[in-house]
């Protein structure tokens, strides 16, 4: 059974990865997935579909970007999707800013110049991802209204897409008391942990 974690970055995707591995799932290579950003931007979803044949479960980019989940759903009948969320859009935004500040801004919210110079998949990759995904500009790369609007709209669209297929989508906040048990029921396995591991937290 194929599983796609399609929640936004900073919604517990690292913890989900650890949990899925514990339950025997082979996770897709995250860096190889991130390198498919340009294909996603150009609408070349077939390369993403082909990459999704290389493992049992996937998370992070490009799987939480735009309508990618729709192409995956069509190409992988019977696949399950996990939409992880935070307590609120503001909490998600603040967590993302803290994480990027640590990764790319030397402790402060990164500037467009810093993002353009950041070396990750390629120099400027993170700038290209942010501006393409959220529709922001060089003048205000982390425009709060645009990022939060994307977060809300994306989650709403995913929920609406699967509204008549409750067995195919798990909407989950990893902080929920019964979240891990719901996860286990969703994937059809007995619990192997007491709860979700809390990893990659940004303070």
PLM segments and residue spans:
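Short active-site oxyanion
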Residues: 1-3, 55-57, 80, 167-171
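Conserved aromatic-histidine-acidic binding/catalytic patches
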Residues: 4-8, 60, 84, 146, ...
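PAPS-dependent sulfotransferase catalytic domain
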Residues: 21-26, 32, 42, 46-52, 63-66, 69-173, 178-185, ...
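The conserved 3'-phosphoadenosine-5'-phosphosulfate
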Residues: 31-40, 82-92, 114-115, 153-203
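Gly/lys/ser-thr-rich phosphate-binding loops in alpha/beta enzymes
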Residues: 46-85
């Amino acid at each position: 059974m194929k599983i796609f974690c399609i929640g936004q970055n900073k919604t517990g995707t690292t913890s989900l990865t650890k949990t899925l591995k514990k339950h025997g799932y082979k996770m897709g290579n995250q860096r190889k997935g991130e390198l498919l950003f340009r294909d996603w931007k150009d609408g070349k979803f077939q390369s993403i579909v082909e990459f999704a044949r290389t493992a049992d479960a996937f998370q992070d980019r490009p799987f939480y970007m735009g309508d990618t989940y729709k192409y995956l759903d069509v190409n992988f009948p019977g696949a399950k999707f996990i939409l992880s969320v935070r307590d609120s859009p503001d909490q998600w935004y603040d967590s993302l800013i803290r994480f990027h500040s640590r990764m790319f801004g030397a402790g402060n919210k990164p500037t467009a110049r810093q993002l353009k110079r950041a070396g990750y998949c390629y120099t400027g990759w993170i700038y290209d991802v942010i501006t393409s995904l959220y529709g922001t500009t060089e003048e205000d790369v982390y425009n709060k209204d645009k990022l939060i609007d994307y977060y809300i709209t994306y989650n709403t669209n995913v929920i609406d897409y699967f509204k008549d297929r409750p067995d195919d989508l798990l909407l989950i906040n990893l902080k929920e008391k019964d979240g891990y048990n719901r996860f286990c029921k969703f994937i059809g396995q007995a619990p192997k942990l007491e709860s979700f591991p809390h990893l990659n937290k940004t303070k």
